[in-house]
Amino acid sequence: MGYPDRQVTETRNTVSFSAAGHRWGVILAGGDGTRLQPLTRLACGDNRPKQFCPLLGGKTLLAHTRQRIAKAIDPDHVLFVLTKKHEPFYKRALESIPGFQKIVQPHNQGTLPAILWSLLHLFHADERALVAFFPSDHYFGDEAAFISTIERSFDFAEKEPDSVILLGAGAERPETEYGWIEPGSVTLSGFGREFVSVRRFWEKPPLETARLLLAQGCLWNTFVMIGSVAAFLEMIRNTAPVLFETFKSALPHSEVEFDERKMQVIYDTMASSDFSREVLAASTERLRVASCGEVGWSDLGEPRRFIAALAQNGTDNPWAATDICNKCGLTHEQIVTLSGPEKNKIQFHESAMLSSSR
């Protein structure tokens, strides 16, 4: 059903594989961001998801993500997975993006359908695609180290097209709200210790387990993934065959666009599903993990973690310190803004499950 090495043409848009090769990116921007709504309401006055909120340096988190990955992937080869009800928040920012690059879900049903739709859409355009998936609303303090790992992972995926690479961040504390990756001991000949097997996933472990994982050198799961489009699709077909065939049936053989009416029915009748839990956890034999080191990564999933990233970024948002404490349910015992030469740091008590930022 794919057309390798061809041009995909639509009104006012031509995707040329000769310019950017077969490297693609997918930004997952369809989430609702409910955990951070107290903060986004404070910043924007509405319930927009955090990826569409200018929380760092006056730019939205989506804009930061686009700027970051443009260092590794041609912007013409970046797809956006969105959700229809969020259109008022992304329409203006993405109005110059061709329709081929925007996948608009009827509503948010989790990461698995969002990823599957984008993979089928991309495979129909370029069967030889190597694709990297990026959350739209995360933070990386050391972007150079992050991008370097992305580049090396693309190189690895090109040589080992049956593998899928996960990017792990060096853990800085026993975080109980993150997913963890326990590396295995298997390496591929010629690649040293940079890309190793995955023994197990640990999703939001209790504190004692998180302390053990930290001591053992396990990594935080950034949910950045790189591999061939064929490898990703095979993983989903093996672990979620019903969903795979259901989505495949909605993709015409002669066009790139999905049947919107079919997709509406599919989304209305399907249950929410999680890619990490339902696909990755059941496919560890195919996975490799690459550490990008202590890059200051945060998922910005809660106000406390956002404030830590704000401090690390050196951004001065005047509404942040006092209002977030009051309106997001944080006490002054949980968060203390330091002054003097350390004013760019924020310190959390252990009860808040965070230590001071680097």
Where are these regions (language model features)?
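Solvent-exposed alpha-helices and their adjacent loops that cap or buttress functional pockets
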Residues: 16-20, 45, 71-73, 124-126, ...
